[in-house]
Amino acid sequence: MQSHPLIFCITFCISIGLIFFPLNPQYTFRSVPHKYPRKKDEWDKIPIFAYADLHKKKLGWTELRYPSIFNKDEIDYILYDPEISYTYTGKEVVVSLGQYDSIFVSSDFKHKKAYNAKSHYLPHVRPVSQNLQIDLFKTIHDRGLQPHYHHLMYDKYRKVFYRFALMPDDNIKPFSNNPHQSFSIIILNKDYEIIGETKFPGNTYAHHLCFVGKKGLYISENNENNPQFDENKLVFRCFTLQGRKK
């Protein structure tokens, strides 16, 4: 029986550097190989993933690095938020950055290729540095005004990808679990070509609560701002792919 190493996504944390969040929470490893602040030409040296081979008891970095899309040096507490979402098809890993139009695809965790995955509801999105010394609530408010990509999902039943895009909103509620901002879902086929995009209203869905099933994409309606909200029920609406109207 062939074994494969566990793959870990690397998430940046200002206070301690890098943290590995594995698929199995039983294994947690920490390291600080890249300190703050970073230079704009250092990003292509920073790995996106680490791996753990439990048979060989070996930890290491993959050779898949961040793309060179950060155009300014970080200064003191003016830093980038390199948030990513990723999914794995069984053959390729697909990475989506929150502040970039394109997605990146790799089949060997070393080389990557960019594909356009821009929402036509948003302007072009590029990484924006943030001043972490200003008021936290203002930071959350300012981020709500920025176009932003959320999570990326792979639908193995229909061989498509769903990329969530959040619309700018001037009324973000800090620490709320009930986002009221509108969002869209960009649909890409197995060749990473955009085949459609659907916009959803705010105050209706909890876009961060979703999953893929045999019948379609399920998105939660458990949003307190939804007039039909019932705290005693967990409700998901199933969305299916429809052909384009001619």
How would you label these PLM feature ranges?
Residues 39-57, 101-104, 176-193, 232-245:
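Beta-propeller blade signature
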Residues 19, 28, 93, 161-163, ...:
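Hydrophobic beta-strand positions that form the internal "hydrophobic ladder"
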Residues 4-22, 26, 76-89, 144-157, ...:
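Structural signature of eukaryotic scaffold interfaces centered on beta-propeller domains
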Residues 143-188:
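Loop/turn-rich, solvent-exposed surfaces of beta-rich toroidal or solenoidal domains
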Residues 1-6, 58-79, 113-144, 199-204, ...:
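Surface-exposed loop and turn segments in beta-propeller and other repeat-based domains
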Residues 22-44, 163-180, 222-236:
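Short, conserved, GDST-rich strand-edge loop motifs in beta-rich repeat architectures
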Residues 38-107:
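Loop-centered beta-sheet repeat module
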Residues 1-54:
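Long, acidic/polar, low-complexity amphipathic helices and coiled-coil-like
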